[in-house]
Amino acid sequence: MKRKLFSILSVFLLLTMLTSTVSAGGNIKLSGAFRLGSLIFDGTLTGVGGYTEGVTVTLTATGNPVVTCTNQGGSQAPGQNPPKVTTSGNQFIEPSDIDEKGKAGVSVETDEPVLTAKRAGCPSNRWTVSMVVYWTDANVVVTDSATGVRLLEQVYTCDPTQQTATSVSCTLVSETSFH
């Protein structure tokens, strides 16, 4: 009788431990919107309460630059056939930034893209490059900071024709949860 009771309690304890470990990560969801600076994603991340070392959010974006080349005398000329630019940025979300419900705010910004004057299509590298990027694609990836394991990936397509000086319209085209 004791052996049977011990076996039942052991199985129950094991199931309880497995359930709490599996649910530690929760059902990770990310919602938000894009805005401009370089490219910025602001939103809310949920289901990350069990990540004791925090999580990292990485934003990678690709776009078409419109380039203006300026020489030392101040004369300007458009760049010729500049290549697409890709840039990224990270935000580390510390455990203390995650509330008791497993929710955290997200504000991740890509670095400013850089093109040399020559790559931008300017006559020489002595010219100064200024550019506006019309974003076409964005990827947001959430990883476990302790293990580097990918938890969530969202892929967006951005509409350059809807971009203004301060806003951009990006549509979620796919979402993959890895946990």
Residue ranges and their predicted role:
Residues 1-24:
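Sec-dependent, cleavable N-terminal signal peptides
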Residues 24-179:
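Mature extracytoplasmic or otherwise solvent-exposed domains
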